Amino acid sequence: MTPLVLIPGMMCDWRLFAPQLEALGRRPVLLAAPTKHDTMEGLAAAILAFAPPRFALAGLSMGGIVAMEMLHQAPERIERLALLDTNPRAEAPEVQARRIPQIEKAMSGRLRAVLRDEMKPNYLANGPDRQRILDLCMEMAIVLGPEVFARQSRALAGRHDRQAALAAYRGPALVLMGVEDRLCPRDRHELMHSLMPQSRFVVVEDAGHLPTLEQPDAVTRELLAWLEQPAT
């Protein structure tokens, strides 16, 4: 059974995938922590260093960006690829510019304010679990702390466009997004699907940027189906 490497998004940990982990049964799963480097290249290389020789790879948001960098660095090791609520392009200059004051604010002891006012409110669709998920996101972020926030922010700001890596990939692929994702909108996912025409493109209703938590059953079904596809 092919091992699965899961990469969470910015300022998230294994709990981002907690509902899916329960459904994966006896499949070997490695939960990556992209927290120790401030470049996308460094984050990807660190995960590749401990990953199995060949594996299935899934990442959400920043985790998807790290996954695409891993695909660029070691395409022969990735048996199948799932990209959730993410973006293959380099960071836009206007977003880069916003990161500097966010880092300064977080490092001055105001990480909670950065997350509350500038980031997390845009993550989720409206729904009965919205506040519970927001609280979980805040808890994960506070545990990781401002230094991780700064490193991840710098890695995102300096990342490269990885469309060419996707276009060259031929393995089973899943592109999935929440219909109300405002951070990584639909056109980014349609682009990834067009670059990997063999991929399945799924839009999850009643979900925003974190469908693994907002609509866990729907996401779990799609991930299990992706894992069961024949390898090429």
Residue ranges and their predicted role:
Residues 207-220:
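Catalytic histidine-centered segment of alpha/beta-hydrolase-like enzymes
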Residues 72-73, 77-117:
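Flexible "cap/lid" loop of the alpha/beta hydrolase fold
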Residues 91-94, 110-168:
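Conserved alpha/beta-hydrolase catalytic His-Asp/Glu region
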Residues 169, 175-177, 181:
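Short beta-strand/loop motif that positions the catalytic acidic residue
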Residues 190-209:
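Catalytic histidine neighborhood in serine/cysteine hydrolases
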Residues 1-46, 60:
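Conserved HGGG/HGGXW glycine-rich cap/lid loop of the alpha/beta-hydrolase fold
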Residues 59-63, 67:
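Gly/Ala-rich beta-loop-alpha elbow adjacent to hydrolase catalytic centers
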Residues 171, 185-194:
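Short alpha-helix in the alpha/beta-hydrolase fold that links the catalytic acid
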